[in-house]
Amino acid sequence: MGNFIAEIAIIKPLHNLFDYEIPNTFKYVTPGSRVTVEFGKKLVTGFVINIKKETKLSNTKLKKIIEIIDDTPVLDEEILNLFKWVSNYYHAPLGQVIGLGTPSYLRNGKEIFDANYNTKNFKEDELENTFNLTKEQLI
């Protein structure tokens, strides 16, 4: 098998990680990346935990990653290690630990936006005239 395999944590109460083939068109899949995969008959968001070269599954059973959601991993190595430790210590499914430890927009596969993008920089004189408060309102 020429392609690499990603071990994916799905945010469900399951103790297993699931193997998915990384298509050749996806260049930057690393641990901590969010991906969209087919799980059963649904498309779900998963988190890449590990990259490996081999799997015990046959080629016919191995599904491919459908989409990489972010350009860079959303979970760094330190956070991933913390989630793994919590999962091991409390005997909790890794996918659920990640689900509890991340904001809902990450779990739901939504794009991350930059809060500073496309904001207007105000000049001081513009800010001074923004509010015309009375003396009673200032107290």
What are these regions (language model features)?
Residues M1-I139:
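Accessory, non-ATPase domains that flank or precede helicase/AAA+ motor cores in DNA-metabolism machines
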